[in-house]
Amino acid sequence: MIGFAVFSSFNRFTTIFVCVLLCVVYLLSYASGEYDGRDSSSGSNNDRAPSNEFGSCTDGKCIKRTSQDITSGMWFGPRLGRRRRADRKPEINSDIEAFANAFEEPHWAIVTIPETEKRQITQFTPRLGRESGEDYFSYGFPKDQEELYTEEQIYLPLFASRLGRRVPWTPSPRLGRQLHNIVDKPRQNFNDPRF
């Protein structure tokens, strides 16, 4: 019984260890296989010299690298933003391709319909719902004094009068006390020198 418990825990430990080891080996072979699969002619397509295939030059100082240095950097994965070569042509859905072909070769016929004048051209004059009897070319000048007097009588004052006053111009008391004589208001203090 004790032997079975020891054997089962040993068996679990070895199984887990073997699985982890296989995963690490697989990941390392996948990461290094990406760089081993490159063709060597890509280095000659650059403007680099063939003797400096694995070197990097900055400010005229070239550092020689070996192939082991390149694969040792793969522990951290490929560079971010690195793009892979896309040799394959992107696949296009057949429905999208048929739709694009329909737009490239239009089978549409453009038909123009002659315009017939159904509406009459009218001059729009806004009147706010009622007819005004004003002459359009009078420019608001009265022809004589009678017309001026009748226009003043017709129109109501623009502002409501204060406290029932009907005088055309009522001065404010702040304009000066000497204006009381204009409206014929009696003085309240006859002895006051300010009046």
Curated annotation (Swiss-Prot):
A hormone that controls sex pheromone production in females and pheromone responsiveness in male. Also mediates visceral muscle contractile activity (myotropic activity). It comes from the Eukaryota. This is PBAN-type neuropeptides. Belongs to the pyrokinin family. Keywords: Amidation, Cleavage on pair of basic residues, Hormone, Neuropeptide, Pyrrolidone carboxylic acid, Secreted, Signal. It is found in: Secreted. GO terms for biological process: neuropeptide signaling pathway. Residues 34-63, 86-117, 131-153, 178-195 form a propeptide. Residues 1-33 form the signal peptide. The modification Leucine amide is found at L80, L128, L163, L175. One of its GO terms (molecular function) is myostimulatory hormone activity. The modification Pyrrolidone carboxylic acid is found at Q120. GO terms for cellular component: extracellular space. The keyword DNA-binding does not apply. The gene is PBAN.
